[in-house]
Structures are given as C-alpha cells and as structure tokens.
C-alpha cells in the first residue's frame, strides 16, 4: 500500500462540490471512480479543502492509498487518461509517508476570488468569474479588508450550514487589487468557515460600490450575526489556490 499526495486542478462548474453528494456529481467521486477503473480498488481521496458547488481549484491537495504498484508518473498518466474529458487534471503527484494527511497536516490554505468589473456580459469567463457591472473602488475595498485581518468571531461571514465547532478564526491575509478590468481578492488562513471567503468578498463589493463604508464592514463583523451580512458573492469567481504543509 502506497500513499500518494496529489495536486489537482479543476473547473467546478459541472460539480456539486468536492465532497461526494447523494444528489449530484462531485470532484471526489470523479477521481475515485477514475482510480477504480485502472486499479479495481475502492479508494477514498481526501482533500485539504472541500469546495462548494461551482467553486474551482488551481492546486487542490489530496491524498489516496493505492495497493497496485505504481510510480507517481504512472499514476498521474493513468488517472488523467481516465478522467478525460472531465475538467479535472492531476498536475502533481508524489509518494508521502503513510501518516501524511492532506487535511489534518495542512497548516495554511489560500483562496483567490476573481471579479470582472465591466458592463459587457462575460463570454469566455462565464462561470469562472463574477461579473460586476458598476465600477469598484479597489483602494477602498483593500483598506476596509484590513479590518478583517487577525483573530475574530466570523459568525457574520459563515453559512448557517457551517459545521465548524467555533466561528473564531485567524485571517492571515486579505488583499484586493486591480489588474485591468479584473479585481482579484486573495485570502489566506490556517482554515476557513463555510462561505467565509464568498461572504467577505460580497461585503467588500458593497464597500467598492460606496454602499458600505469601512465602518459598516467593521460593524457587520462585530455584530457576529449572519443577518448583518451585506451580500454573499456567487461561487463562480472562487478558486482554491494552495495548501501549506510543514
């Protein structure tokens, strides 16, 4: 039995999320079934993060135990062949110790959120970014975002269905920058609550539109009440971009 660490890229549009679902296709299911087709083994692929329906990944980390003798190269080639034409690709693979765990060994996770700030509808980026027609004040968004850095009760910014035992998290980084018509929000923390990044992005968009001030954002945070949330951004623009390990 060999434990492999995988780095996976995927387009989340066709899936109900990473985790297996009873009511629709998932990324986890697609990968596990692809492995079964060339190993005849029932495996479980465990990830560093569990993205929601429609959320994408640039470099999701996961691990899987396989009995069949395989090198990382052969596993990558076979898995990518079996995954076609699904929008999922293994872009990295290595052998790791038997006690290495993609989720529990992870000490940092990062996400990126893409906004296309223009009036024209999206064509190539439809489902891959959030189109915001009204101009956004990125400087105001970035300045307001810094109030969310640090240890806080993020109840306002978590889903009512969040299963985390505590709403208290430490947000290490939250930046907002403009690149032409694209506005990129980057967030990093040891872990995030369900819908936390999307909720922060939606609220920052209100700041960018001038509907909220930085003070309003801080008041929403301090309210520790989901009803105080201004806006939850759609999943389209959210990407899991990396996991950090010791």
Swiss-Prot record:
Binding site for substrate: 111
Keywords carried by this UniProt record: Isomerase, tRNA processing
Class of the enzyme per the UniProt entry, highest EC level: isomerase
Gene3D superfamilies linked: Pseudouridine synthase I, catalytic domain, C-terminal subdomain, Pseudouridine synthase I, catalytic domain, N-terminal subdomain
Pfam families: PseudoU_synth_1 (PF01416)
EC number from the UniProt entry: 5.4.99.12
Annotated active site: 52 (nucleophile)
Entry GO MF terms: RNA binding; tRNA pseudouridine(38-40) synthase activity
Lineage top rank: taxon: Bacteria
GO biological process: tRNA pseudouridine synthesis
Catalysed reaction equations from the record: uridine(38/39/40) in tRNA = pseudouridine(38/39/40) in tRNA
SUPFAM superfamilies recorded: Pseudouridine synthase
Function of the protein: Formation of pseudouridine at positions 38, 39 and 40 in the anticodon stem and loop of transfer RNAs.
Assembly with partners or alone: Homodimer.
Family per record: Belongs to the tRNA pseudouridine synthase TruA family.
The protein's name: tRNA pseudouridine synthase A
Gene name of this polypeptide: truA
């Amino acid at each position: 039995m060999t434990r492999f660490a995988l780095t996976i890229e995927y387009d989340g549009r066709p899936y109900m999320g990473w985790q297996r679902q009873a009511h629709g296709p998932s990324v986890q299911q697609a990968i596990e079934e692809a492995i079964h087709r060339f190993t005849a083994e029932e495996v479980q692929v465990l990830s560093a993060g569990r993205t929601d329906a429609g959320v994408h990944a640039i470099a999701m980390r996961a691990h899987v135990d396989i009995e069949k003798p395989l090198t990382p190269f052969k596993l990558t080639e076979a898995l990518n062949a079996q995954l076609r034409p699904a929008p999922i690709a293994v872009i990295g693979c290595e052998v790791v110790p038997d006690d290495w765990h993609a989720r529990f060994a992870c000490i940092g996770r990062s996400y990126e959120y893409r906004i296309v700030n223009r009036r024209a509808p999206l064509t190539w980026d439809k489902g891959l970014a959030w189109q915001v027609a009204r101009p956004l004040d990125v400087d105001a968004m970035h300045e307001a975002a810094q109030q969310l850095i640090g240890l806080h009760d993020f109840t306002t910014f978590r889903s009512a269905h969040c299963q985390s035992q505590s709403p208290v998290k430490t947000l290490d980084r939250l930046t907002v920058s403009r690149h032409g018509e694209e506005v990129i929000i980057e967030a990093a923390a040891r872990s995030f609550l369900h819908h936390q990044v999307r909720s922060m992005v939606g609220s920052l968009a209100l700041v960018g539109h001038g509907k909220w001030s930085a003070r309003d954002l801080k008041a929403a945070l301090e309210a520790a009440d989901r009803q105080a949330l201004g806006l939850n951004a759609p999943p389209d623009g959210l990407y899991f971009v990396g996991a950090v390990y010791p």
